[in-house]
Amino acid sequence: MADDELETYRLWRIRKTVLQMVHDRGYLVAQDELDQPLETFKVQYGDRPSEKKPARSDLTILVAHNDDPADQMFVFFPEDAKIGIKTIKAICQQMQEQNISRAIIVVQTGMTPSAKQSIGDMAPKYMLEHFLEAELMVNITEHELVPEHVVMTAEEKAELLARYKLKDSQLPRIQQCDPVARYFGLRRGQVVKIIRPSETAGRYITYRLVV
């Protein structure tokens, strides 16, 4: 079926972007997973989504951070087109059982207001982020108009502020809801280094504080 073919392609593309995203956040992802071609995805997961081959739940990802293997994160692909509070509770139950506090939820069409509220209520014990499938069809950081973003460590931020004798409040800002900030999972108070090509200087670097 043409619908199955299109849906399989979408699921492969979305999962690929998610793997790139968690890899760019410093989580461990095997290179063959990052490079997985569509045909290999079909062999591994199936090519008939209409028959639950794959079911979205088959695509669940669990990754550990490069710097701290205890820092693990789930990526869930719920079956429900619109996510309600029941799904959020089931996700938190699974996180609790495995002692994992971070997760990304990939939603098909959206979330109910009560589900969104419950995500806010569960922070900071459970840090849940959500992305629409449509947002993950392309990797925003690969767009030619998006400059390179490098997330600074707390030490690098302190060094930057000391070097230029600045306070946080004096840095230019980037909103936490900015698409690139969301891609990197940035939190308020973090600083990102933005590197743009420059005809005169080779490259032009700016710093932004997440607010």
Curated annotation (Swiss-Prot):
Pfam families named in the record: RNA_pol_Rpb5_C, RNA_pol_Rpb5_N
Compartment annotation: Nucleus
Segments crossing the lipid bilayer: none
GO annotation, cellular component aspect: RNA polymerase I complex; RNA polymerase II, core complex; RNA polymerase III complex
GO terms under biological process: transcription by RNA polymerase II; transcription elongation by RNA polymerase I; tRNA transcription by RNA polymerase III
Organism: Caenorhabditis elegans
Family as reported in the entry's similarity comment: Belongs to the archaeal Rpo5/eukaryotic RPB5 RNA polymerase subunit family.
Lineage: Eukaryota, Metazoa, Ecdysozoa, Nematoda, Chromadorea
Purpose: DNA-dependent RNA polymerase catalyzes the transcription of DNA into RNA using the four ribonucleoside triphosphates as substrates. Common component of RNA polymerases I, II and III which synthesize ribosomal RNA precursors, mRNA precursors and many functional non-coding RNAs, and small RNAs, such as 5S rRNA and tRNAs, respectively. Pol II is the central component of the basal RNA polymerase II transcription machinery. Pols are composed of mobile elements that move relative to each other.
The protein's name: DNA-directed RNA polymerases I, II, and III subunit RPABC1
UniProt keywords, alphabetically: DNA-directed RNA polymerase, Nucleus, Transcription
Single GO molecular function: DNA binding
PROSITE patterns reported for this sequence: RNA_POL_H_23KD
Subunit structure: Component of the RNA polymerase I (Pol I), RNA polymerase II (Pol II) and RNA polymerase III (Pol III) complexes consisting of at least 13, 12 and 17 subunits, respectively. In RNA Pol II, this subunit is present in 2-fold molar excess over the other subunits.
InterPro entries membership: Arch_Rpo5/euc_Rpb5, RNA_pol_Rpb5_N, RNA_pol_Rpb5_N_sf, RNA_pol_subH/Rpb5_C, RNA_pol_subH/Rpb5_CS, RPB5-like_sf
